[in-house]
């Protein structure tokens, strides 16, 4: 009787053990996934993926590309959180998308902060709109430029900005905001400086090659003036950290020096005429520039060269116009040109034949 009772007990034990083994045996994943293929998720899930797709398809050439991308990603993450919480009850999906949503919102806030309208002081607005805005300098970068190591100073009429052979050129760089200044050399009037023009751009360019120099001209306020002044040393360090702004300054200073050379040719040039200057120089300006270069390069004394240039420019209107070669300094050796015969010209092998352009 005991043997008959033990047989069903053994059978039940084996059956229980096999059922446990079956429960531990892994089920092929294809069976469960294929069964889930027929399930269609809620509409919120699909709208979230549409938001992701639209955000990734925004062209990078669009001005607000990054802002629109972050908006669409944030909207998609929000819909994912709603879908995982209300329709799927998936805690892990909700947590991950909440993290992604927070990251996108932080980045979106930073982008909107950078795009905020930057307020430029009214007194500096003219300088920005005339000099820096046409060169696509952002307002925030201009504000950084004018907000550090920079101050606005005032000069009354008759006060001196710089004195020749006394004032150092290594201290500052300035832009005239209001008024008018007069530049002279040894009592000779050279030109005027008008608003939105650099006051000491030639000196700034010269100090990049030679340090410790003095002003060679005297600059006096011809009216009540206000000007924007940078510390030369700190401005140089700042421009080294901003390559784009460094190139902008190189261009603006070079253009300002060119305008001052135009003013040397016509001292009566006013601010309105300066705005209308043509890119190409007139014949009179070319002659004046040639005289100045020849005078400076041919004279051992800078003062004699300037006097020669001033006398030549003042008498240009009264004297008959001659060729640039005739007005060259006597110390400069003229270019020797071969005399051509009617038929042909023979030139020695060591000689250089120069043809004069019409």
UniProtKB/Swiss-Prot annotation:
The keyword Glycoprotein applies. GO terms for molecular function: cAMP binding; structural molecule activity. Glycans are attached at residues 2, 30. It comes from the Eukaryota. The chain crosses the membrane at residues 49-69, 71-91, 93-113. GO terms for biological process: cell migration involved in heart development; epithelial cell-cell adhesion; heart development; hematopoietic progenitor cell differentiation; positive regulation of locomotion; positive regulation of receptor recycling; regulation of cell shape; regulation of endocytic recycling. It is a multi-pass membrane protein. Changing residue 202 to A: No effect on cAMP-binding. Residues 1-48, 92 are extracellular. Residues 70, 114-358 are cytoplasmic. Expressed in epithelial cells, skeletal muscle, heart and intestinal smooth muscle (at protein level). Expressed in fetal and adult heart and skeletal muscle. Residues 313-323 have a biased composition (Low complexity). Disruption phenotype: Skeletal muscle regeneration appears to be less efficient and delayed. Knockout mice are deficient to adapt heart rate to physiological stress, this deficiency develops in older mice. They show severe sinus node dysfunction with long pauses and intercurrent periods of normal synus rhythm. The sinus node structure is abnormal with a loss of pacemaker tissue from the inferior part of the sinus node and a compact structure of the superior sinus node. They have inpaired functional recovery after ischemia/reperfusion injury. Residues 313-350 are annotated as: Disordered. One of its GO terms (cellular component) is lateral plasma membrane. It is found in: Lateral cell membrane; Cell junction, Tight junction; Membrane; Cell membrane, Sarcolemma. The modification Phosphoserine is found at residues 295, 318. Residues 136-186 are annotated as: Required for interaction with KCNK2. Residues 93-115 are annotated as: Required for interaction with CAV3. InterPro entries: cNMP-bd_dom_sf (IPR018490), POPDC1-3 (IPR006916), POPDC1-3_dom (IPR055272). Keywords: cAMP, cAMP-binding, Cell adhesion, Cell junction, Cell membrane, Developmental protein, Glycoprotein, Membrane, Nucleotide-binding, Phosphoprotein, Tight junction, Transmembrane, Transmembrane helix. Belongs to the popeye family. Homodimer. Homodimerization requires the C-terminus cytoplasmic region. Interacts (via the C-terminus cytoplasmic tail) with TJP1. Interacts (via the C-terminus cytoplasmic tail) with ARHGEF25/GEFT (via the DH domain). Interacts (via the C-terminus cytoplasmic tail) with VAMP3. Interacts with KCNK2; the interaction enhances KCNK2 surface expression and is inhibited by cAMP. Interacts with CAV3. Cell adhesion molecule involved in the establishment and/or maintenance of cell integrity. Involved in the formation and regulation of the tight junction (TJ) paracellular permeability barrier in epithelial cells. Plays a role in VAMP3-mediated vesicular transport and recycling of different receptor molecules through its interaction with VAMP3. Plays a role in the regulation of cell shape and movement by modulating the Rho-family GTPase activity through its interaction with ARHGEF25/GEFT. Induces primordial adhesive contact and aggregation of epithelial cells in a Ca(2+)-independent manner. This is Popeye domain-containing protein 1.
């Amino acid at each position: 009787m005991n043997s008959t009772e033990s047989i069903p007990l053994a059978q039940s034990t084996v059956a229980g053990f096999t059922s446990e083994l079956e429960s531990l045996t892994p089920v092929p994943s294809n069976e469960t996934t294929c069964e889930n293929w027929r399930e269609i998720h809620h509409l919120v899930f699909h709208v979230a993926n549409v938001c992701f797709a639209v955000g990734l398809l925004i062209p990078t050439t669009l001005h607000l590309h990054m802002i629109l991308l972050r908006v669409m990603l944030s909207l998609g993450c929000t819909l994912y959180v709603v879908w995982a919480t209300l329709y799927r009850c998936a805690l892990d999906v909700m947590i991950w998308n909440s993290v992604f949503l927070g990251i996108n919102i932080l980045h979106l806030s930073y982008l909107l902060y950078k795009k905020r309208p930057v307020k430029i002081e009214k007194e500096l607005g003219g300088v920005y709109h005339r000099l820096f805005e046409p060169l696509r300098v952002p307002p925030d970068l201009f504000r950084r430029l004018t907000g550090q190591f920079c101050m606005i100073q005032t000069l009354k009429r008759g006060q001196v900005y710089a004195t020749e052979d006394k004032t150092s050129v290594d201290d500052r760089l300035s832009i005239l905001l209001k008024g008018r200044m007069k530049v002279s050399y040894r009592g000779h009037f050279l030109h005027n400086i008008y608003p939105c023009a650099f006051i000491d751009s030639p000196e700034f360019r010269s100090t990049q090659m030679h340090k410790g120099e003095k002003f060679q001209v005297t600059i006096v306020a011809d009216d009540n003036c206000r000007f924007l002044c940078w510390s030369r040393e700190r401005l140089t360090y700042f421009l080294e950290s901003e390559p784009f702004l460094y190139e902008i300054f190189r261009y603006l200073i070079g253009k300002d020096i060119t305008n001052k050379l135009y003013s040397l040719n016509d001292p009566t040039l006013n601010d309105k005429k300066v705005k209308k200057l043509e890119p190409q120089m007139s014949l009179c300006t070319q002659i004046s520039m040639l005289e100045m270069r020849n005078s400076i390069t041919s004279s051992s004394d800078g003062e004699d060269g300037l006097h020669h240039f001033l006398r030549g420019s003042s008498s240009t209107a009264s004297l008959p116009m001659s060729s640039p070669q005739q007005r060259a300094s006597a110390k400069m050796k003229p270019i020797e040109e071969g005399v051509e015969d009617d038929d042909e010209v023979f030139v020695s092998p060591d000689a250089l034949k120069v043809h004069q352009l019409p």
